[in-house]
Every structure is written in structure tokens, then in C-alpha cells.
């Protein structure tokens, strides 16, 4: 009888070399009051946020109080907390509160103070995005019509710079005074939930405007540990070191883009990478493409404010977000070195009625797209009517993981294999990364791409070369299933056992 020899299948071993991380940098951040009356302290280094001096991995979700019924705030906040959210972020849309100059409305579901008290009562921290310009798919980005169309200062353009005109800045100061009054007694230093504020949004002009807003905020009493800005778009000049913390983002789709095609930028969001920003964000309102200069990236921790929890639907670009689109994108952010996850949106809502107009973006006022007049559901994990979507549960598992292992992850930079960011649109390439402190860590794999089938990867294992020696995982090669994504631990110390 003839003897048949079979050739074993070729093993696809993927290799990465991990170096021991260098020391974190601290001492140059210009923060507000960092301690609360109980003595708890929030601070940061170049690597992560710190809580009482220990690495801290915050998990944040966006929920717009003025877009949701006041009577249902607490239920919505409790759903967020149950989903693993620790911090609530919210916009203060100027035109929701001062549609007519000098007539302020903080009543009902527009009551910021009551919302922050609800956050406190549920046990959630808060970051308030103060504007004056916000976006959020709101009419004029949140500018009241009387601001947008005023002849008392140079025209305020959503497409360009927000000017430093004295009369305009005086109006902004009154807005900040109102917001400061709403937050009085609720700041971190008072024992309240507000640990930070964001100044303006998606600003591309000179840095002195944002610095002026920071000074105004502090002057009217908004003294908080963290002052933030979006890490996009590129500004005219670099923000002075340590003044504001850039927060980043990435989305599964871009309903604001004029094209109906899938852009390369959106494909790029499903790989592990060094670049922190989704360059397609806010391409409708900014002519300057790209994130800010990342040459100083290592001076700041990689925190996000807008990891897409879904996407709104525009008239011309009617996207449908799959739960895996959201969960795998968040995993890619985590595997790329994120040390603080912020979802936009986490809880959907509905635009309030304006006194003189509807309050959504539209072609009628010069926007390049139309969206729904009332709904701001965003296909979020918690929807416009409080409904729980499948990706709520996908993200809850990821949030629980970040909550349990956040302190370890915050000490572990991301390392990418050679060529990880090249030919990223090729579905046959395996997308993976490692986060490690040089001894132990986590392996991240994303074999998923929105709107594109990703084939199984056969006979696969990984060789992780650490300072103390190499490790191959798993010992026996496996097949990575099509359209899958996951993370594995390695060498973790479990009460003395690795």
C-alpha cells in the first residue's frame, strides 16, 4: 500500500517587538483646582489621567440634556451607568438658551443645573462642552441667529474663524457667566460632579482665541481640573504647551460629507494606527483638513471625546450603522493606545422647538446637508426614546473590560507591527496591535471592516518579543474567523501566577 505524505499547512506567524515604555512626563499642565473637599485629586501625565495619583481610565458618554425630557433624565443616566459609563459629557447650545438676546431660558429640559444634579445623584461625573460654538448638528452650530447675523462685529462664520471682537467676546462672557451660574456649587472643587469643560469646538483659527475663552471661563468661576479642546482640525498655530488637553475621535460613517461614497478616511478608522484623529470629522465646517500637528502627541494622553456610538442620518447620506461597526471601531481606538474612551453619542435625543425657526442644520441656512428636523437619535446605544440597541451590550462588555483593567492599560503604550498602516484597505491583511508595559499586556485583533467582508485568517499565531524574551500565542495556530474582533491578555499577574 502506498504511503501518502501530507504537508502541514503553512503557519502565518505575525511578529512584533515591544520595548519597555519610558517614564511619563508631568508638571507642565495648566489645570484648575484638582482636589475636591474629600481630598480626592484628578490630575494627569503625558500617559494618562490620574485619580489620587494612580493611573485612571475614564469612560465617557455624550447625552444632551436639552434634547431629552427632564422627567426622563435620571432613567437615561442610570442606563448609561449600567452600560459602564463613568462620565457624562453634554453640550450647552447657546441658541437653546438665548434665542433672543438678553432673554435666557434655563427652565424645564433646558435646566443645566438640574441635569448636573441628576448626574451627581446617579453617581456620574460630568464634562460640560460650553461652546460658544458647538456643532452637534444644531442650527448655526449653536450660535443664536442674533449672533450669527449681527452687524455689531465682523460676520461670525461657521466656516472660518470665530473673531476676537470686543462686542462679540462680551456676549460670550455673558454666556459663560450664565453657564458658570448654573454650575455654581457643582464643580469638582465643591464636591460636585463637574471635572472639566470643553472650550468651543472644532476650531481652526489662532490659539489666542481659545486661550481667551479659557481665561473667561476661569474669570466667571469655571475652575475645574480639566480644560479640553477637540484635537481637530489643524489650527493656525499650536496651542501653548499644557494649556488644554486635546480630545480625539473617530466615526463609522460621515453623514456630513457631500459624497455618498465610502471615503478612505473611514476605512482608516478600522485599523490600529499611530495617528489619533479621524480626518473626516467636521469636513463640512472646516476647510483645513486633518488633525492638529501631532509632533507633540507624546506630551498628552490619548483621550477621546467622539468615538462614534452611531451616526446621524442626513438626507443624501442615509447610513445604517451595524452594532459591530461601533464595537470594532472602539476596539481599534483602544488597541491604538486610547487611555480614556468618550462616545458620541451614547444617548440619543430630539431637538427642542425654536421660537422662530427649527433648530437643526439645513441647506436653508447654508449647510451642505439636510437632517431631520426633530430626531437626533444618532443610532446611539441608547436611542431617542430610551430604547436599548444591540451595541449597548457590545460596548458594555468593552467598558467593563476597560473599567477592570484600565489602570493596567493606562501604563501600556500601543505597539504596532511593521507596515500596520500601509495598504489598509486590503481585506487580506491582518490588523493587530499590542499594548504592553514590557512584561505583560494585551493583544488586539480586528478582522472587521464596515461595509466590507473580511475573510478568515487561517493558521495564525503571534510572536511578541518582549525585553525579557519572546512569547508565541496561541501555542497552536488558530483560524481567526471572518468579520471578528477581540483582545487577549498575556503574561498577566494573577495573584502570583502568570
Report the location of each language-model feature.
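N-terminal carbohydrate-binding accessory modules
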Residues: 2-87, 117
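Carbohydrate-binding surfaces of carbohydrate-active enzymes
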Residues: 23, 157, 168-183, 190-198, ...
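Acidic-and-aromatic substrate-binding clefts and catalytic sites of carbohydrate-active enzymes
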Residues: 40, 65-71, 97-98, 102-107, ...
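A cross-family glycoside hydrolase active-site/sugar-binding cleft signature
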Residues: 59-64, 91, 127-131, 198-200, ...
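Short, solvent-exposed loop/turn and secondary-structure capping segments
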Residues: 72-74, 100-101, 129-131, 137-142, ...
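Aromatic-lined substrate-binding rim segments of carbohydrate-active enzymes
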Residues: 73-146, 214-219
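Aromatic- and acidic-residue-enriched carbohydrate-binding clefts of CAZyme catalytic domains
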Residues: 91-103, 108, 136-167, 360-384
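Active-site region of glycoside hydrolase catalytic domains
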Residues: 121-124, 134-282, 287-313, 332-338
Amino acid at each position: 500500500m502506498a504511503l501518502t505524505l501530507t504537508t502541514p499547512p503553512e503557519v502565518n506567524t505575525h511578529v512584533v517587538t515591544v520595548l519597555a515604555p519610558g517614564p511619563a512626563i508631568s508638571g507642565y499642565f495648566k489645570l484648575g483646582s484638582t482636589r475636591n473637599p474629600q481630598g480626592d485629586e484628578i490630575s494627569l501625565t503625558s500617559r494618562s489621567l490620574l485619580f489620587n495619583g494612580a493611573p485612571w481610565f475614564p469612560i465617557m458618554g455624550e447625552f444632551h440634556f436639552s434634547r431629552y425630557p427632564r422627567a426622563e433624565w435620571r432613567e437615561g443616566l442610570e442606563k448609561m451607568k449600567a452600560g459602564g459609563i463613568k462620565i457624562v459629557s453634554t453640550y450647552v447650545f447657546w441658541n437653546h438658551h438665548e434665542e433672543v438676546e438678553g432673554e435666557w431660558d434655563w427652565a424645564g429640559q433646558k435646566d443645566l443645573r438640574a441635569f448636573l444634579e441628576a448626574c451627581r445623584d446617579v453617581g456620574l461625573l460630568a464634562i460640560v462642552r460650553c461652546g460658544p460654538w458647538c456643532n452637534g448638528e444644531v442650527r448655526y452650530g449653536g450660535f443664536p441667529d442674533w449672533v450669527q447675523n449681527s452687524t455689531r462685529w465682523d460676520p461670525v462664520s461657521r466656516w472660518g474663524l470665530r473673531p476676537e471682537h470686543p462686542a462679540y467676546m462680551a456676549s460670550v462672557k455673558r454666556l459663560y457667566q450664565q453657564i458658570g451660574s448654573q454650575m455654581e456649587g457643582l464643580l469638582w472643587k465643591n464636591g460636585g460632579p463637574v471635572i472639566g469643560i470643553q472650550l468651543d469646538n472644532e476650531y481652526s483659527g489662532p490659539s489666542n482665541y481659545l486661550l481667551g475663552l479659557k481665561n473667561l471661563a476661569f474669570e466667571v468661576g469655571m475652575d475645574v481640573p480639566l480644560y479640553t479642546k477637540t484635537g481637530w482640525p489643524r489650527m493656525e498655530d499650536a496651542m501653548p504647551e499644557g494649556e488644554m488637553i486635546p480630545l480625539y475621535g473617530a466615526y463609522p460613517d460621515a453623514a456630513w460629507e457631500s459624497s455618498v461614497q465610502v471615503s478612505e478616511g473611514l476605512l482608516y478608522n478600522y485599523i490600529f494606527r499611530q495617528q489619533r484623529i479621524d480626518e473626516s470629522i467636521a469636513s463640512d465646517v472646516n476647510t483645513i483638513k486633518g488633525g492638529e500637528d501631532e509632533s507633540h502627541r507624546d506630551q498628552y494622553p490619548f483621550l477621546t471625546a467622539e468615538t462614534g456610538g452611531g451616526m446621524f442620518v442626513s438626507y443624501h447620506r442615509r447610513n445604517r450603522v451595524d452594532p459591530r461597526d461601533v464595537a470594532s471601531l472602539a476596539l481599534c481606538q483602544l488597541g491604538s493606545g486610547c487611555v480614556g474612551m468618550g462616545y458620541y453619542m451614547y444617548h440619543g435625543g430630539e431637538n427642542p422647538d425654536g421660537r422662530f425657526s427649527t433648530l437643526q442644520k439645513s441647506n436653508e441656512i447654508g449647510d451642505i446637508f439636510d437632517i431631520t428636523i426633530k430626531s437626533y437619535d444618532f443610532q446611539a446605544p441608547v436611542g431617542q426614546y430610551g430604547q436599548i440597541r444591540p451595541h449597548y451590550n457590545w460596548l458594555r462588555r468593552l467598558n467593563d473590560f476597560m473599567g477592570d483593567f484600565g489602570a493596567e492599560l493606562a501604563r501600556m503604550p500601543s505597539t504596532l507591527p511593521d507596515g500596520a498602516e500601509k495598504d489598509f484597505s486590503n481585506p487580506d491583511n491582518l490588523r493587530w496591535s499590542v499594548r504592553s508595559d514590557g512584561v505583560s499586556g494585551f493583544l488586539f485583533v480586528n478582522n472587521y471592516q464596515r461595509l466590507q467582508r473580511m475573510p478568515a485568517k487561517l493558521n495564525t499565531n503571534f510572536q511578541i518579543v518582549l525585553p525579557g524574551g519572546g512569547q508565541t500565542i496561541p501555542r497552536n495556530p488558530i483560524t481567526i474567523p471572518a468579520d471578528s474582533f477581540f483582545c487577549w491578555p498575556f503574561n498577566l499577574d494573577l495573584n502570583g501566577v502568570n
